């Protein structure tokens, strides 16, 4: 009965696989770069940086404003002037209760080093946003590649388990026939059934694990969750090896740290620029009206008269003392510069160590993969010979099951070695700046 159910499940899965879209690694990477939601936030930050540049550039352009106002001086102010011309020491004049004004105002910086440096800082921040996006894209490529390799590995594992189940089912049928003819013990049949049940559990676990891996892959590349996908069968004989050209010191991670150091230096310059004077051009075009009764503005007469006042000039601002605020900013910026230098030096040394270890890992995993492949093929041959001898009544059931277990271990070791080989090569592709090979 179990065999019938297993056969039915394989048939259903075979029909289900026909509806799957088979995606190559390059297709998954392209989809991820175009659709990944987290990466889109980095794209948004790049766009935001462009707007920041425009915002800072606007501070160097003329600023034109229109203003208007109406005041009710219910206690009118007075002005006091010399009254000797009128035969008294002071002349006191009370202003009218209502006054209104309309003006056009112009202000444009002629020299402002802080505004120029702020614009330069915004360009550096834009560069940081771009580098952060590129680094996030590289991290996404590595993440998708590992998921893809893992799904391939699980698919291979499922295929091997299915083959092992088929072999054990044949062995069970033979053992059952031997038992029916008093040529084998009932315990031998039970032993095969136990191993067969263990393989069925492994198969179910591997299928569940594969489903979860595909779900995660679909999430990362923003593929419709209700549609099925499948990975291509790996070509274990051909791995696109990374060229061992040494650590690429223009990796986006290192460029980010260098740019952060540049940003800290420019922030220090911005604090120093605060000591410099600023010069601005100013101008105004103003009309003002006064009256003792607001209704007079709606009738012609002497009280309904607007007085024009125009002017142009320059304003100079020279910082003298700010309570040592700028000095503290300069010292803080210097600490940021020193920390940025240390971070870059530490990252560079760390990545050089990573590269050296990755080269060793690749060579070691390459050897392990070759050995485990040979060991896996050898274990299959041994199992086949022992199985044939068992059919002939020469070998015992214990020998068959022991060789079957050894073959299963060799198969798992082979799959693990292949996955480790791919991951170590992926690490080197990243450290040498060759990840673009995977997209092609």
What are these regions (language model features)?
Residues 67-104, 282-318:
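Small/polar, glycine/serine/threonine/aspartate-rich low-complexity segments that form flexible
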Residues 19-69, 75, 225, 230-267, ...:
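Bacterial Sec-pathway N-terminal export signals of envelope proteins
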Residues 51, 139-250, 365:
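Periplasmic alpha-helical coiled-coil/stalk elements that build and connect Gram-negative outer-membrane
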Residues 7, 18, 413-440:
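Acidic, low-complexity, intrinsically disordered peripheral segments
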Residues 40-44, 57-58, 110-137, 187, ...:
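Sec/SRP-type N-terminal targeting helices
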Residues 179-183, 390-394, 431:
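A short glycine-centered flexible hinge/capping loop motif at secondary-structure junctions
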Residues 4-13:
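Sec-dependent N-terminal signal peptides
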Residues 187, 392-416:
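Short terminal targeting/anchoring segments
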């Amino acid at each position: 009965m179990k065999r019938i159910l297993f056969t039915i499940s394989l048939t259903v899965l075979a029909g289900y696989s026909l509806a799957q879209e088979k995606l190559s690694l390059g297709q998954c990477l392209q989809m991820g770069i175009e659709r990944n939601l987290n990466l889109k936030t980095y794209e948004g930050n790049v766009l935001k940086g462009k707007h920041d540049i425009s915002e800072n550039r606007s501070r160097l352009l003329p600023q034109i404003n229109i203003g208007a106002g109406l005041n009710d001086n219910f206690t009118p102010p007075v002005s006091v002037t010399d009254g000797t011309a009128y035969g008294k020491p002071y002349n006191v004049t009370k202003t009218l209760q209502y006054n209104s004004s309309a003006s056009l105002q112009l202000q444009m910086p002629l020299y402002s080093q802080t505004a120029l440096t702020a614009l330069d800082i915004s360009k550096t921040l834009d560069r940081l946003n771009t580098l952060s996006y590129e680094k996030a894209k590289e991290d996404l490529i590595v993440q998708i590649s590992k998921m893809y390799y893992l799904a391939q590995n699980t698919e291979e594992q499922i295929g091997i388990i299915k083959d092992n189940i088929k072999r054990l089912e044949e062995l069970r049928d033979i053992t059952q026939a031997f038992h029916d003819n008093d040529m084998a013990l009932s315990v031998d049949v039970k032993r095969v059934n136990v191993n067969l049940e263990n393989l069925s559990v492994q198969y179910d676990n591997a299928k569940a694990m594969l489903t979860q891996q595909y779900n995660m892959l679909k999430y990362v590349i923003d593929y419709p969750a209700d549609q099925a996908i499948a990975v291509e069968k790996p070509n274990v004989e051909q791995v696109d090896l990374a060229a061992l050209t040494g650590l690429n010191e223009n990796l986006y991670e290192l460029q980010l740290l260098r740019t952060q150091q540049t940003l800290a230096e420019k922030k220090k310059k911005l604090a120093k620029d605060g000591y410099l004077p600023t010069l601005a051009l100013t101008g105004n075009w103003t009309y003002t009206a006064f009256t003792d009764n607001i209704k007079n503005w709606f009738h012609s007469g002497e009280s309904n008269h607007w007085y024009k006042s125009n002017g142009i000039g320059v304003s100079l601002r020279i910082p003298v003392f700010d309570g040592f605020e700028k000095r503290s900013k300069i010292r803080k910026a210097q600490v940021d510069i020193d920390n940025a230098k240390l971070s870059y030096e530490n990252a560079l040394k760390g990545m050089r160590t990573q590269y050296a270890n990755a080269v060793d890992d690749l060579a070691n995993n390459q050897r392990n993969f070759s050995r485990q492949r040979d060991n896996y093929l050898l274990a299959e041959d041994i199992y086949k010979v022992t199985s044939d001898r068992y059919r002939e009544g020469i070998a015992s059931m214990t020998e068959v099951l022991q060789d079957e277990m050894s073959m299963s271990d060799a198969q798992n070791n082979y799959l693990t070695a292949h996955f480790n080989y791919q991951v170590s090569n992926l690490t080197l592709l990243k450290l040498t700046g060759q990840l673009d090979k995977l997209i092609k």
